[in-house]
């Protein structure tokens, strides 16, 4: 379960040609039905191959190679061929899960809640417990942080009125949902009314670098993603002011479709929860700044559901 003991104080389904292509792929990859001992159809999916997808990050290309020991282990434990799907947006991964083309994925907390509300078959089973870093704290949580460039004179929330704000992606938790709902409550108005201009940069890395180069005045970034940018030498912690941080957010959920057969889902869980004991997975765990994966359940993300509901209600009333 997600705890905060060690922590410091809408995507729409697409239609048209792309959707039809995805539907065709889904139909071709559909698994066979498994049967119970009594001979009755259990209506669980047991496909010949599993498609594993991840939300794109600033380190996606490097992660493709680092994930190989993980996908190799999944192939060994499940006896399935593993196909890696690297999309270009949060929405693409969600669409793949909803269409059944993707069976296993890494999502952001907000995109997971969006997907699971559209289809309860999308279910979280694990996440990683992070090591402490420059801004990141130890444990299975992280925070949204509002940063400005040191020396810019932007040292208070009040000083940000009328400036340019960088967000990440409409499907991002720390780079859109938390700022709009929680920080919006702090300032008492919509971000678009408080700031002179609000832009989406596309990634936490780009938001962090944009602040450092003065292309945006302020940005909301995830603490663990900011650490990645520091580790790459593109920015230093002392280069920024941290004006605000959110309460802890559960880390990126690893999800599967729960209409997969029980034994198959158990093997997928074993793939990730046992990585800490696999020497060949050391580089992967180092890359995500973790020693181990921990089990997670849908209720661990109820805080995100509450925030989404508040955002949706505000949108309707507006």
Short names for language-model regions:
Residues 1-17:
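N-terminal secretory signal peptides that target proteins for export/translocation
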């Amino acid at each position: 379960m997600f705890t905060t003991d060690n922590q410091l104080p809408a995507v729409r389904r697409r239609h048209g040609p792309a959707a039809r292509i995805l539907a065709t792929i889904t139909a071709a990859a559909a698994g066979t039905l498994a049967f119970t001992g009594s001979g009755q159809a259990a209506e669980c999916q047991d496909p010949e191959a599993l498609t594993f997808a991840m939300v794109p990050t600033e380190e996606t290309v490097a992660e493709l190679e680092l994930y190989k020991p993980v996908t190799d282990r999944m192939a060994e434990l499940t006896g399935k061929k593993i196909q890696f799907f690297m999309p270009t947006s949060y929405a693409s991964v969600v669409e793949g899960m909803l269409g059944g083309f993707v069976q296993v994925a890494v999502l952001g907390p907000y995109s997971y809640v969006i997907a699971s509300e559209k289809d309860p078959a999308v279910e979280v089973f694990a996440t990683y417990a992070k090591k402490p870093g420059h801004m990141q704290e130890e444990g299975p949580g992280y925070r949204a942080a509002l940063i400005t460039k040191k020396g810019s004179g932007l040292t208070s929330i009040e000083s940000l009125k009328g400036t340019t704000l960088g967000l990440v992606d409409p499907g991002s938790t720390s780079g859109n949902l938390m700022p709009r709902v929680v920080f919006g409550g702090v300032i008492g108005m919509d971000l678009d009314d408080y700031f002179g201009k609000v832009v989406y940069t596309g990634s936490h890395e780009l938001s962090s670098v944009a602040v450092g180069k003065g292309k945006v005045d302020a940005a909301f970034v995830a603490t663990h993603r900011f650490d990645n940018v520091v580790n790459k030498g593109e920015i230093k912690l002392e280069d920024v002011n941290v004006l605000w941080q959110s309460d802890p957010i559960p880390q990126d959920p690893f999800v599967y479709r729960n209409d997969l057969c029980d034994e198959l889902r158990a093997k997928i869980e074993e793939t990730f929860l046992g990585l800490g004991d696999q020497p060949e997975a050391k580089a992967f765990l180092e890359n995500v700044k973790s020693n181990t994966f921990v089990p997670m359940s849908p209720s661990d993300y109820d805080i995100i559901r509450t925030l989404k509901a508040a955002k949706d209600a505000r949108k309707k009333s507006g």
